[in-house]
Each structure stands twice: as C-alpha cells, then as structure tokens.
C-alpha cells in the first residue's frame, strides 16, 4: 500500500505516493526494463507508510537494480492528469556501491546514452530525463503535470511491435 507524502517545489507542497531516481553519469542514465507493461523506466516505486520519499527512491533502486545510491538532490514533482491522481517525485542519485542485477521488477538494468534511449522507454520519462539532466547542471526543481490516458498506455504497446516488424522489413529489402 502506498503512503502519500508532500514534497515542496517553489513553496507549494505536492502530494506524492511514488519516488524515483535518475542516476546520471556523464551523458548516460540508469534505466531498468519493467516486465509488466514491458518498458524501460527509471528505478523507483511506491512510498511505504512512514517512509520518506528519498528513502523510498534509495530502497527501491537497491531492490530493483542491486545498486546502493546516495540522493544528490531534487529534480521535481510530476503530478498526473488522466489515469492517475497521485504524483511522483524524482531525485538525482549517485551510485555508492553494489552490482547490477536483475530482479522480479527489473528484467534488465543498464546505463544508456541520453541520445540513444530505448524505443520502449515509457513516454512520460522523456520530459523527466530532460529535467534530470538540467538538474544535474544546476537547474532548479520543477513541477510538471503529465497527461497519461488509456490511449497513451495502449499506443505504447505498439512500440514493442515496431521492433520485430522493422527487422522483417529490413530482411525483405535485402
């Protein structure tokens, strides 16, 4: 069960139930492959009762990826318009130890270049990653409303089909 916490950006407190972390090294970011609705995303999860969001982000990152991290700062709060009413908080993090591993929540873990993100990165992460890289360069925390509707969820699945279809098209052209 998720617990609601408040995170303040520009003097306004926003309710959040989830916390994530962007671990950035140079031009690369840590992502994980979720098994259900399969897709790539940042590590993180739901806040437990009596757990601060920073601790959630660190705990979930370790459980999902095998990396122990240190929170470096706040990127922003992302509230939803559409399917969800709860918000997420995103932090910057640094790897302090551990080794990458697969888990029931992360079938694969890897560092990817910002210019070569996986095609199947969940669409709402593109803005979050732009914000995270800006934050790593000193930008102030942000609040953004992200629209996620059933259309977004259903159309996202088509990106998984494009990969094998593109491969078949390439073979036919040869």
Please place each PLM-identified region on the residue numbering.
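Active-site segment of metal-dependent pyrophosphate-handling enzymes
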Residues: 66-99
């Amino acid at each position: 069960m998720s617990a609601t916490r408040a995170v303040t950006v520009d003097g306004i407190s926003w309710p959040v139930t989830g916390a994530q972390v962007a671990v950035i090294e140079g031009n690369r970011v840590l992502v994980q492959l979720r098994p259900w609705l399969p897709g790539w995303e940042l590590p993180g999860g739901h806040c437990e009762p009596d757990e601060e969001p920073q601790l959630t982000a660190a705990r979930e990152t370790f459980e999902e990826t095998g990396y122990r991290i240190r929170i470096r700062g706040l990127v922003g709060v992302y509230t939803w318009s559409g399917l969800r009413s709860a918000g997420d908080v995103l932090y910057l993090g640094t790897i302090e130890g551990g080794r990458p591993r697969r888990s029931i929540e992360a079938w694969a873990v890897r560092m990817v270049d910002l210019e070569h993100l996986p095609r199947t990165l969940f669409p709402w992460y593109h803005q979050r990653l732009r914000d995270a890289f800006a934050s790593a360069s000193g930008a102030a925390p942000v609040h953004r409303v992200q629209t996620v509707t059933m259309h977004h969820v259903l159309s996202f699945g088509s990106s998984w089909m494009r990969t094998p279809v593109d491969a078949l098209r390439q073979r036919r052209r040869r």
